[in-house]
């Protein structure tokens, strides 16, 4: 991009933008350099908003889903130990100049950074604090997270065995004490603080369902193996905020729409801050469409607009 003439301005915080009388955009920023903060204003014929979602904005997320209390972290900051800058200041700025914002698509929640080790269905089970399964593990994440939010502690145990094909996070999760190994079901139950007879019955019942190809408890039909080969791998899984599905309203040309539904001249949007692209849920990896396809359209149309007289 530098070879193409692009200029990168680091440590620049956008604090506002508005239309000029001539139709250009005034973009106000605070630039931090050498321990000082300088206010600057840039003028542009075209402006592309690509500031990301607002998963780290606790208040806005809680307004969308009141079940999301302060202890629910994001997938970018799963343990609450690092800074997550996915907040909604630019969304507020866009609304202030008349941009429409979608409402009602919500958030995508994932059980992601805890005990879950598999990237496919059929090789693990989810159990509650009593050691019992409570959900069809092959259902979409939205259904699973809703079931988890109904649990008293809003978390569950994920169990698999030595036969399953685990993801790249296995070693890291073992080292950090997120996932554990046990040679027997009894040892696993003890470390999980659940009744051993209950957990043993849960696994036996599940294995019978694997043999039949149908689980009468949850209706599950996707199985890849029995859970029986030690060592057993288990860990507590929680819910994390992964994606915001609401944001600035746009059209197929990546133009920002006003509250009246009219394209705002010279204003474009791409990425997670664009709302309503996926509806109320999305497939894993589909965000690349929003970033690359809509990003390409936003950039191309912004350039065309900037070249106008």
Pin down the residues of each PLM region.
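Glycine-rich loop(s) and the adjacent beta-strand/alpha-helix scaffold that form part
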Residues: 34-36, 42-111, 297
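A conserved beta-strand/loop element that lines the FAD pocket in flavoprotein oxidoreductases
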Residues: 2-15, 104
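Hydrophobic alpha-helical segments, especially N-terminal targeting/anchoring helices
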Residues: 19, 31, 127-128, 250, ...
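An anion/pyrophosphate-binding glycine-rich loop and adjacent beta-alpha core
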Residues: 83, 91-198
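Conserved beta-strand-loop-beta-strand element in the redox core of flavoprotein oxidoreductases
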Residues: 10, 15-41, 47
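Internal hydrophobic alpha-helix adjacent to the cofactor/substrate pocket in enzyme cavities
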Residues: 90-100, 192-195, 200-203, 290-309
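A glycine-rich dinucleotide-binding beta-alpha-beta segment and adjacent secondary-structure elements
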Residues: 16, 198-281
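Glycine-rich phosphate/pyrophosphate-binding beta-alpha loops
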Residues: 109-117, 142-145, 239-245, 273-288
């Amino acid at each position: 991009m530098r070879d193409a003439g692009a200029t990168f301005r680091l440590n620049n915080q956008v604090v506002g933008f508005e239309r000029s009388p001539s139709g250009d955009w005034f973009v106000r920023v605070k630039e931090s350099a050498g321990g000082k903060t300088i206010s600057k204003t840039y003028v542009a014929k075209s402006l592309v908003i690509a500031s990301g979602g607002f998963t780290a904005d606790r208040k806005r997320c809680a307004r969308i889903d009141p079940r999301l209390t302060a202890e629910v972290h994001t997938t970018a900051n799963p343990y609450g130990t690092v800074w997550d800058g996915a907040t909604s200041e630019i969304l507020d700025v866009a609304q202030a100049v008349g941009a429409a914002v979608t409402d009602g698509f919500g958030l995508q929640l994932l059980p992601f950074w805890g005990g879950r080790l598999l990237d496919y269905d059929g090789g693990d089970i989810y159990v509650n604090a009593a050691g019992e399964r409570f959900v069809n593990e092959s259902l979409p994440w939205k259904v699973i997270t809703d079931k988890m939010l109904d649990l008293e502690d809003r978390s569950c145990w994920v169990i698999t065995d030595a036969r399953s094909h685990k993801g790249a996070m296995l070693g890291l999760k073992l080292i950090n004490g997120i996932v554990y190994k046990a040679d027997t079901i009894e040892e696993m139950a003890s470390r999980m603080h659940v009744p051993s007879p209950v957990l043993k019955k849960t696994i036996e019942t599940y294995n019978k369902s694997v043999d039949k190809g149908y689980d009468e408890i949850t209706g599950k039909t996707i199985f890849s193996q029995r859970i029986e080969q030690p060592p057993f791998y288990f860990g507590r899984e929680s819910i994390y905020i992964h994606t915001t599905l609401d944001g600035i309203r746009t059209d197929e040309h990546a133009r920002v729409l006003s509250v009246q539904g009219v394209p705002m001249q010279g204003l474009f949007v791409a990425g997670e801050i664009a709302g309503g692209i996926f509806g109320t849920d999305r497939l894993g990896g589909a965000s690349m469409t929003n970033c690359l396809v809509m990003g390409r359209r936003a950039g191309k149309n912004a350039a065309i607009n900037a070249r106008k007289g």
